[in-house]
């Protein structure tokens, strides 16, 4: 026996492997269990292709043994095992992967579909040195008579020698480090810790992972006393729920899995279970919660799906699998097609992941579309909870996703107590109606009281009520729907008149030009114009906006954190040409006209939901007029 150096013999490289690539020391167990599963897969594959191998699937298992006194963890499998040469190649060369080579060599074998070798890079084994200062590997290759022992204490090298081992397989012993001021290594010798780590990372490895577990049970001979019982238990569930056929799974199984996996007390609102084959093959189990997570609206909330590779947890929250507008979706994806980086924790942003993300996005949209069509009550409940995310999705990224989301939007409306889709609105439009009308406000009740609403409804036109801050921004990204443009009824250029009505109102404005100019001057730059209008029904006055920034946009933009209150809509004060107040204004003195004008302006601001610029001045003027 002689000591050998690693072929990638740099201590710096090994230090990088165990200190930089992996951010959580606990994943060493996941890596070793995955390696053991790979080894069993290889022998199981051999049993499928070689009749001389008399082994059945139920013969395979992975053992974990803990010894607190010697501070060791032992992971044993009865898989394919390794020869001295394979130990040299697989463990003596950092980043050499036997599993990857095995997959490559058997890529064309149809029976290779019956196994699922996890490893792609030969780095996982070296994560052992994050928790152990010495690692011992005893392995006997299937069909060989001689076993070999590989021993290393880290970057200084390793030894290989012959040894005794009765059966084929591999036994890895980790000599756990002593605790330090900053690190508790002893916890990895506790059965509770190991049990939890297996359930967290390796619950769906398809071979039994067994360990002796001790439990305190009542002593039947002495009341009040307990005795310790030790028995071998299987720690993993082995069969992932998402790998089963949907027809075999009861709704309560989906619900219980969700509540246990994602720590929710309520059943999910909707379950999406899909298997996709094609450019990328994957299983996905997705949940739409009934209620938003408690931290959903906080900066700390992290979106993402759990990502598995052949049943092994690779990433707890893979944000790249979900667009922001579906950030509320919980669930997981399991695929063997993903290209893994040298650490399973650092998934490459590769082409396969993008294909999967695109397929998931499409699947969720299709499910929501079906829900909207077939279960309206359920969809309205969903939209009330998460509809805001879809609206932001329309607005975000310059409207890149608007076409895929626009038919999922719901809005309150003047025509019904129930919310409507854009498609439904257009389907109800009057023959004479060319545009989609909307108004913005704090809630539907306040919007319904806007002066402009009356005239639009008198025409037989429906008005969409935009009650979320993002609504108008999203609609401006859409620009039009089914060839119909969106029109804000609170803009000064709202056109509901025929030619004769337009001619009449133009003449009235021309005749009252001197009065209107005085009123504009009285407002001292607060408005860009004062004009008479025929679109207010029975109401005396309103504020409208001209240009891009609407009244609602002004409120929203100036309410944002850090806003400098500099965003202003170009306001227009509109006076009802048919209201008696016009005659009052025409007969007023210059001083009274100024007071009337400011009162009307302040009243119009209140009606529009804007703050008064000078409440005291308004109150004094009102009292004076009384």
Mark where each language-model region is.
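GHKL (Bergerat-fold) ATPase N-terminal catalytic module, capturing the glycine-rich phosphate-binding loop
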Residues: 1-188, 196, 430
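GHKL/Bergerat-fold ATPase module in large chromosome/replication-associated machines
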Residues: 117, 135-157, 177-187, 192-626
């Amino acid at each position: 026996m002689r000591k050998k150096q690693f072929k990638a013999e740099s201590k710096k490289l090994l230090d990088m492997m165990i200190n930089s690539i992996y951010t959580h020391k606990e994943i060493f167990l996941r890596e070793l269990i995955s390696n053991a599963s790979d080894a069993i897969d290889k022998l199981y594959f051999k049993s499928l292709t070689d009749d001389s191998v008399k082994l059945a699937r139920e013969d395979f298992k992975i053992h974990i043994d803990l010894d607190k006194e010697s501070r060791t963890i032992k992971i044993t499998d009865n898989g394919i095992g390794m020869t001295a040469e394979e130990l040299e190649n697989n463990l003596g060369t950092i980043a050499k992967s036997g599993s990857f080579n095995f997959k490559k060599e058997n890529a064309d074998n149809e029976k290779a579909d019956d196994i699922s070798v996890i490893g792609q890079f030969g780095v996982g084994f070296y994560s052992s040195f994050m928790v152990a200062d010495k690692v011992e590997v005893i392995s006997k290759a299937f069909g060989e008579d001689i076993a070999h022992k590989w021993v290393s204490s880290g970057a200084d090298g390793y030894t290989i020698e012959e040894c005794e081992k009765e059966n084929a397989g591999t036994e890895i012993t980790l000599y756990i480090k002593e605790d330090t001021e900053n690190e508790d290594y002893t916890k990895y010798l506790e059965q509770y810790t190991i049990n939890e780590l297996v359930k967290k990372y390796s619950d769906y490895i398809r071979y039994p992972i067994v360990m002796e577990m001790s439990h305190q049970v009542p002593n039947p001979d002495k009341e009040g006393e307990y005795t310790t019982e030790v028995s071998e238990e299987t720690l993993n569930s082995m069969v992932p729920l998402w790998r089963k056929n949907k027809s075999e799974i009861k709704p309560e199984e989906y619900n219980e899995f969700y509540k246990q996996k994602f720590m929710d007390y309520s059943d999910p609102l909707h379950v999406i279970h899909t298997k996709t084959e094609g450019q990328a093959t994957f299983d996905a189990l997705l949940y739409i919660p009934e209620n938003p997570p408690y931290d959903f609206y906080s900066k700390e909330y992290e979106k993402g799906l759990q990502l598995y590779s052949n049943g092994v947890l690779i990433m707890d929250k893979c944000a790249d699998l979900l667009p922001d507008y579906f950030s509320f979706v919980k669930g997981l994806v399991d695929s063997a097609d993903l290209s893994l980086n040298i650490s399973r924790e650092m998934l490459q942003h590769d082409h396969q992941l993008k294909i999967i993300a695109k397929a998931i996005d499409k699947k969720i949209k299709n499910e929501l579309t079906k829900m909207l069509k077939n279960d309206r009550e359920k969809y309205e409940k969903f939209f009330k909870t998460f509809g805001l995310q879809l609206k932001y999705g329309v607005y975000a990224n310059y409207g890149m996703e608007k076409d895929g989301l626009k038919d999922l939007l719901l809005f309150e409306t003047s025509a019904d107590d129930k919310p409507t889709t854009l498609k439904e609105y257009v389907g109800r439009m009057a023959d004479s109606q060319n545009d989609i009308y909307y108004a913005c406000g704090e809630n539907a009740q306040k919007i319904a009281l806007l002066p402009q609403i009356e005239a639009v409804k008198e025409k037989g036109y429906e008005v969409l009520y935009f009650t979320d801050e993002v609504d108008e921004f999203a609609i401006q990204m859409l620009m039009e729907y089914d060839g119909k443009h969106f029109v804000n009824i609170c803009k000064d250029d709202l056109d509901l008149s025929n030619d004769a009505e337009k001619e009449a109102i133009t003449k009235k404005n021309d005749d009252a030009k001197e009065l209107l100019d005085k009123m504009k001057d009285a407002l001292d730059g607060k408005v860009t114009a004062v004009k008479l209008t025929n679109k207010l029904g029975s109401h005396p006055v309103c504020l409208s906006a001209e240009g891009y920034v609407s009244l609602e946009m002004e409120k929203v933009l100036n309410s944002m954190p850090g806003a400098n209150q500099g965003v202003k809509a170009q306001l227009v004060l509109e006076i009802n040409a048919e209201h008696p107040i016009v005659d009052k204004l025409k007969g007023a003195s210059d001083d009274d006209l100024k007071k009337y004008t400011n009162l009307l302006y302040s009243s119009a601001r209140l009606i529009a939901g804007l703050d008064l610029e000078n409440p005291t001045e308004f109150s004094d003027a009102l009292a004076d007029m009384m």
